[in-house]
Amino acid sequence: MATWKSSRVNRKYKTKYRIRSWREYERGLRGRGDVTIWLSQEAIAAWIPPNNGLRGGQRRYSNLAILTALTLRALFRLPLRQTEGFLDSLLRLMGLALKAPDHTTLSRRNQTVEVPSLTRVHDGPISLVVDSTGLKILGSGEWNVHKYKMSRKRRDWRKLHIGVDEEGFIVAARLTASSGDDASTLPDLLDQIEAPIRRFIADGAYDRRSIYDQVGAAGTEDVVIVIPPRRSAVSPRSTNGPWAQREAALQRIHKVGQREWQNESGYRQQARVENGFFRYKSVLGGGLKARSSIAQTREAMIGCRILNRMFELGRPESYAVVS
């Protein structure tokens, strides 16, 4: 049996990129800091919910008001009390006779607030790239662990699974326990996507026949599935349907090596989802502030919506630099 060829690339041979639309991108970067983008007129108009007609106490803040406050909290990485003070000062500066939700209300409503889905309208089939990353919820930072040799046992994480389209927008997301299996969450991600899938890209953690079958059912008739087979992979007995693409990839890798296969198959587009994780942790941090699993899920979904909104304001268009 042929051996697998190395896929490592020396850094000096990697393709370099430059931003083409720098003026538009710079305008979008400035827009991300515009507070009025996040405290919209729509939210202000619907700040106080209408009377529901039922007996008893009425809610003082609408779902959109709570969602706006929690968005500002995530965006500026604020504790709940500072979120209350920050939003209250914004409303005063804008000359609005509105009050910010207090921190106890935010904590309670964070358990029930409705976060809109990440669904985007697409004109046709999409290319989907999926992966997962860890978000810390308990434990010391990396520096304390390194300097003071602190135990890594008292640390806990949640796993954020996302799917991005060819433009880099997050179109599906789910938060699971750190022990959550990547492949088992795929059905939930696919259920969030309305458009058919023409190309599916994922890493070796998704190298299962069930994944090929699920993507085949959710995709177009000629859907292309790009998943690198495991190094221990062998030719399957049956290669019917989408599973046949795995056998073709396996044979091609044995022939030309993994690096060349990645170039030919478009697997390098997997970097889009990695870039999404980099953006999430750079903008929102690598952890979750909420303590309950329900609130943590809402916090992560709000974070994904923030990244999509930033992308709408402006994203870079780059081109390869030929040296």
Features from the language model and the residues they span:
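Charged, often Cys/His-bearing segments associated with DNA-binding zinc-finger transcription factors
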Residues: 1-55, 60, 68, 97-98, ...
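Helix-centered, glycine/charged polyanion-binding patches within enzymatic domains
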Residues: 2-14, 18, 204-281, 290
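Basic, amphipathic alpha-helical segments enriched in Lys/Arg and hydrophobic/aromatic residues
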Residues: 60-75, 259-323
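Polybasic low-complexity intrinsically disordered regions
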Residues: 51-67, 75-81, 85, 89, ...
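Short arginine-rich
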Residues: 94-97, 309
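C-terminal substrate-recognition regions of SAM-dependent nucleic acid methyltransferases
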Residues: 21, 174, 274
